[in-house]
A protein has these predicted regions:
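Small cysteine-rich, disulfide-bonded extracellular modules of the LU/uPAR three-finger superfamily
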Residues: 1-100, 104-140
Length: 140
């Protein structure tokens, strides 16, 4: 699966505000992957439609060096998901999933990064996972 990603306006604004002398937000205790039937656009989730029903919940994981590798490369520098992230098994249809986002909370919260991928229908009993190495965050 090819995953296209970007950083949210929240993260972009935090970076720019850091240059103004403001404190960068603290690292959250957990990060949360969310799935969307209508993907976030331009780092804003106002038009996005997050999956609901069928036992859906955001997938939590700890931000650490196991789950994300150190940035590497140049133009763009990137950090690659280093551990599989498996969502709870759906008990009903999640619809056609076309995007993802990473948040700092299990519901609502601040979007940190987002992306799109080839849409896939997710039904009851399907396995939904991001495999190690298949999600890359890049800074150009």
């Amino acid at each position: 699966m090819t995953v296209t990603s970007g950083f949210s306006q929240y993260v972009e604004n935090a970076c720019l505000n850091w240059f103004r002398g403001t404190t960068f937000p603290a690292v959250p205790a957990n990060l949360y992957l969310a799935l969307f039937t209508t993907a976030p656009v331009n780092g804003v989730d106002s038009a996005a439609v997050e999956v609901s029903g069928g036992s859906y919940a955001r997938k939590s994981f700890v931000p650490n060096t196991t789950n994300f590798g150190a940035p590497s490369g140049a133009a763009p520098a990137s950090s690659i998901l280093g551990a599989n992230q498996v969502f709870i098994t759906p008990t009903g249809s999640w619809g056609t999933v076309a995007g993802w986002a990473m948040y700092d909370a299990s519901s609502a919260g601040n979007m940190l990064a987002y992306g799109i991928f080839t849409p896939v229908a997710v039904g009851s009993g399907d396995t939904v996972e991001f495999l190690s190495g298949n999600l890359t965050l890049s800074v150009a």
